[in-house]
């Protein structure tokens, strides 16, 4: 069964290799780039597929020797090892056959907002954002704050950042949803535990080709930027609000002194939000992704709890509990949270492909 699935991939890979050597393709940069990308995407699967087919052939050849007086025992011993190898290769190939998320290599817009819980929610927005920044640092990603709105106690009402690097979306796409925090606030004299919530959205950065907006569908308002406590931070109308009329999605931006820069930033985030809305619509077709809120704009569902008194982090989607919350938050090592989610998601996808 698996052999018949693998043959077309090998044939396509060999066809691409042949095409890349033709003058017709060599003289067409666009076509050459497309074929090189396709070849690169197939390479790991094809290498494993060839190894699998060779191992399968060796097993069959050895079986023909089972009755041989001199070589029979040796062939049986060798087949034990080959069958173990075949099983391992099959698992690796099944993972490689999972359709790749086309957004996995994209940069992302990270949007964190304070929800219920007042000042404490705002403080946790800052704490989680700092942890994500540390994670980005560990991964060699670059973080650029696009917009931030601070509250009066050193936290944030909202932070929007652009995170760039290899595989950013593939690792952070599982973070979208409501994150609940339980801890004793520094201002709490009675030592009571407060519960607050924040929402996280992960939106792939998109280009003009992926999201084409009709300018007639946009309502653009300009106004003066307001600082903390209502003081003016700018005497010109540099702040911008863009509303997409068909969906009602709007983005305000006032971090830059230039109206043009604010408009440019707002438009980029608007495109990302529209793309996210499209992903959410498609999500209903993919039950494995839906279970994990992957790429979902549904921020109402609680995905994770951070319980500081117990030093506990729980991801409710897969029943993961880790008693190393403070270490994760301080080091930014989210791999120990993300890896089990990725493994669970891959298992779900494999199950779906087998059904």
Swiss-Prot record:
Transmembrane segments: none annotated. InterPro entries: PCRF (IPR005139), Pep_chain_release_fac_I (IPR000352), Pep_chain_release_fac_I_sf (IPR045853), Prokaryotic/Mito_RF (IPR050057), RF-1 (IPR004373). It comes from the Bacteria. The modification N5-methylglutamine is found at residue 231. GO terms for cellular component: cytoplasm. One of its GO terms (molecular function) is translation release factor activity, codon specific. Methylated by PrmC. Methylation increases the termination efficiency of RF1. It is found in: Cytoplasm. The keyword Protein biosynthesis applies. Keywords: Cytoplasm, Methylation, Protein biosynthesis. Belongs to the prokaryotic/mitochondrial release factor family. HAMAP family: Rel_fac_1. This is Peptide chain release factor 1. The lineage of its organism: Bacteria, Pseudomonadati, Campylobacterota, Epsilonproteobacteria, Campylobacterales.
């Amino acid at each position: 069964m698996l052999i018949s699935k693998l043959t077309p991939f090998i044939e396509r890979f060999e066809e691409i290799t042949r095409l890349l050597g033709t003058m017709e393709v060599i003289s067409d940069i666009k076509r050459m780039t497309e074929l090189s990308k396709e070849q690169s995407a197939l390479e790991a699967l094809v290498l494993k597929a060839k190894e699998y087919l060779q191992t399968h052939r060796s097993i069959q050849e050895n079986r023909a020797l089972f009755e041989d007086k001199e070589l029979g025992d040796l062939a049986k011993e060798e087949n034990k090892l080959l069958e173990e190898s075949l099983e391992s290769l099959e698992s690796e190939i099944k993972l490689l056959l999972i359709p790749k998320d086309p957004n996995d290599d994209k940069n992302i817009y990270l949007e964190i907002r304070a929800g219920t819980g007042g000042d404490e929610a705002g403080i946790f927005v800052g704490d989680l954002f700092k942890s994500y920044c540390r994670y980005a640092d560990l991964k060699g990603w670059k973080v650029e704050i696009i917009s931030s709105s601070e509250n009066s106690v050193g936290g944030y009402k909202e932070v929007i950042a652009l995170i760039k690097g290899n595989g950013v979306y593939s690792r952070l796409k599982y973070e979208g949803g409501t994150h609940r925090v339980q801890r004793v606030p520094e201002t709490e004299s009675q030592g009571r535990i407060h519960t607050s919530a924040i929402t996280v959205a992960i939106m792939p950065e998109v280009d003009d080709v992926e999201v084409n907006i009709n300018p007639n569908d946009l309502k653009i308002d300009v106004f003066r930027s307001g600082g903390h406590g209502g003081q003016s931070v700018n005497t010109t109308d540099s702040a911008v609000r863009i509303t997409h009329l068909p969906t009602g999605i709007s983005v305000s931006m006032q971090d830059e002194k230039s109206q043009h820069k604010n408009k440019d930033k707002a438009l980029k985030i608007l495109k990302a939000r529209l793309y996210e809305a499209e992903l959410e619509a498609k999500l209903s077709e993919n039950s494995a992704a839906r279970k994990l809120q992957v790429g979902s704009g549904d921020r109402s569902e609680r995905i994770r709890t951070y319980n500081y008194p117990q030093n506990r982090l729980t991801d409710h989607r897969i029943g993961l509990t880790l008693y190393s919350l403070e270490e994760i938050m301080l080091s930014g090592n989210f791999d120990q949270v993300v890896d089990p989610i990725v493994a669970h998601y891959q298992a779900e996808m494999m199950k779906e492909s087998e059904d």
